C-alpha cells in the first residue's frame, strides 16, 4: 500500500471507503477501494480473491478498469482507473432541462456495449445504479463494480449501515428467485434509462413489498399470461392487488415511440423475453446515436 498516497476520500461504496489516490511511482491518479469484509478475523475468502482476479481480464472502454488487487493481512484493496463523476451526481447537478436526449442515447448505448461485453464473458453486475456509472468530460460512461456482487454478495446494508437501494432491482429477485440471469442487469439499466429521461427514479421503493407494488402499479400486476411461472415464485402471493398496466406515454412522456418500445422491452416481466444487451444495441432508437460531451460541474 505504500505505493499509493491517498489524496482524498471520494465516497463510501457498498463494500467500503473509496479514496482518490496517487501512484507514487507513476503519478497516476486512481480510485482505491478498501473492501470491508465481515470476516475481518478470518481474512479474505480465497473465493473472493479468485473472483476478483478474473475481473482484471475484463478490458472494455465502457468498463471501469480494475488495475490491481492488493491483499494485505485481512484487508483487500482494489485499484481502479479514476473517473471524476458518477451519473447520480451529474443528474442531480444538471440544469432544469435535464440531460439532452442525444446524451441519454449515447450513455445508454455505451452502457449496453459494456453490458454486452460482460454478459458475453458470463459476468453479471447485479447491483447497477446511477452511483456506479462513472462519467468523464469526454462523453464516456463506464460501469463500475462489475462482478463484486458475485465475489462478496449483495449486502442488505452497506458497511456504514445505509440500506442498499432496491430501486433498480429486477422483479424476479424481489420475488425470491434464486437463479437469475444477465436479464437482471437489463432491468436495472431500463430503470436508469427512464430516470435519465424524466430525472425521477422510476420505482423508488422503500421496502421490498413497496418496490414490487410500485412496479405493479406501472406495469400491471403480473399473472401467468404476462409472466409464465410467476405464481410459483417463492415470494409471490395470490393476494397481491391487481393493478392494470399504464401507457408508457404517461410513464416517460418525453420519449419518442422508439425509445418507449426499447424501454418496454428492457422492462419485460419475463426475463426470457427481456431484450438482451446485444440485441438492444441494434434497436432503431440508436439509429442516430452520436457522442456528445457533457458539461461537468
From Swiss-Prot:
<comment type="subunit">
    <text>Interacts with spdya.</text>
</comment>
<dbReference type="InterPro" id="IPR011009">
    <property type="entry name" value="Kinase-like_dom_sf"/>
</dbReference>
<feature type="active site" description="Proton acceptor">
    <location>
        <position position="127"/>
    </location>
</feature>
<dbReference type="InterPro" id="IPR008271">
    <property type="entry name" value="Ser/Thr_kinase_AS"/>
</dbReference>
<feature type="binding site">
    <location>
        <position position="145"/>
    </location>
    <ligand>
        <name>ATP</name>
    </ligand>
</feature>
<dbReference type="GO" id="GO:0000082">
    <property type="term" value="P:G1/S transition of mitotic cell cycle"/>
</dbReference>
<dbReference type="GO" id="GO:0004693">
    <property type="term" value="F:cyclin-dependent protein serine/threonine kinase activity"/>
</dbReference>
<dbReference type="GO" id="GO:0007165">
    <property type="term" value="P:signal transduction"/>
</dbReference>
<keyword id="KW-0131">Cell cycle</keyword>
<feature type="binding site">
    <location>
        <position position="86"/>
    </location>
    <ligand>
        <name>ATP</name>
    </ligand>
</feature>
<protein>
    <recommendedName>
        <fullName>Cyclin-dependent kinase 2</fullName>
        <ecNumber>2.7.11.22</ecNumber>
    </recommendedName>
</protein>
<dbReference type="InterPro" id="IPR017441">
    <property type="entry name" value="Protein_kinase_ATP_BS"/>
</dbReference>
<feature type="domain" description="Protein kinase">
    <location>
        <begin position="4"/>
        <end position="286"/>
    </location>
</feature>
<dbReference type="GO" id="GO:0097472">
    <property type="term" value="F:cyclin-dependent protein kinase activity"/>
</dbReference>
<feature type="binding site">
    <location>
        <begin position="129"/>
        <end position="132"/>
    </location>
    <ligand>
        <name>ATP</name>
    </ligand>
</feature>
<dbReference type="InterPro" id="IPR000719">
    <property type="entry name" value="Prot_kinase_dom"/>
</dbReference>
<keyword id="KW-0597">Phosphoprotein</keyword>
<dbReference type="GO" id="GO:0006468">
    <property type="term" value="P:protein phosphorylation"/>
</dbReference>
<feature type="binding site">
    <location>
        <begin position="10"/>
        <end position="18"/>
    </location>
    <ligand>
        <name>ATP</name>
    </ligand>
</feature>
<dbReference type="GO" id="GO:0051301">
    <property type="term" value="P:cell division"/>
</dbReference>
<keyword id="KW-0498">Mitosis</keyword>
<comment type="function">
    <text>Serine/threonine-protein kinase involved in the control of the cell cycle; essential for meiosis, but dispensable for mitosis. Triggers duplication of centrosomes and DNA. Acts at the G1-S transition to promote the E2F transcriptional program and the initiation of DNA synthesis, and modulates G2 progression; controls the timing of entry into mitosis/meiosis by controlling the subsequent activation of cyclin B/CDK1 by phosphorylation, and coordinates the activation of cyclin B/CDK1 at the centrosome and in the nucleus.</text>
</comment>
<feature type="binding site">
    <location>
        <begin position="81"/>
        <end position="83"/>
    </location>
    <ligand>
        <name>ATP</name>
    </ligand>
</feature>
<feature type="modified residue" description="Phosphothreonine; by CAK">
    <location>
        <position position="160"/>
    </location>
</feature>
<dbReference type="GO" id="GO:0005737">
    <property type="term" value="C:cytoplasm"/>
</dbReference>
<dbReference type="GO" id="GO:0000307">
    <property type="term" value="C:cyclin-dependent protein kinase holoenzyme complex"/>
</dbReference>
<feature type="modified residue" description="Phosphothreonine">
    <location>
        <position position="14"/>
    </location>
</feature>
<feature type="binding site">
    <location>
        <position position="33"/>
    </location>
    <ligand>
        <name>ATP</name>
    </ligand>
</feature>
<feature type="modified residue" description="Phosphotyrosine">
    <location>
        <position position="15"/>
    </location>
</feature>
<keyword id="KW-0547">Nucleotide-binding</keyword>
<comment type="similarity">
    <text>Belongs to the protein kinase superfamily. CMGC Ser/Thr protein kinase family. CDC2/CDKX subfamily.</text>
</comment>
<keyword id="KW-0132">Cell division</keyword>
<dbReference type="GO" id="GO:0005524">
    <property type="term" value="F:ATP binding"/>
</dbReference>
<dbReference type="GO" id="GO:0106310">
    <property type="term" value="F:protein serine kinase activity"/>
</dbReference>
<dbReference type="GO" id="GO:0010468">
    <property type="term" value="P:regulation of gene expression"/>
</dbReference>
<keyword id="KW-0808">Transferase</keyword>
<dbReference type="GO" id="GO:0005634">
    <property type="term" value="C:nucleus"/>
</dbReference>
<dbReference type="InterPro" id="IPR050108">
    <property type="entry name" value="CDK"/>
</dbReference>
<dbReference type="Pfam" id="PF00069">
    <property type="entry name" value="Pkinase"/>
</dbReference>
<dbReference type="GO" id="GO:0010389">
    <property type="term" value="P:regulation of G2/M transition of mitotic cell cycle"/>
</dbReference>
<keyword id="KW-0723">Serine/threonine-protein kinase</keyword>
<keyword id="KW-0067">ATP-binding</keyword>
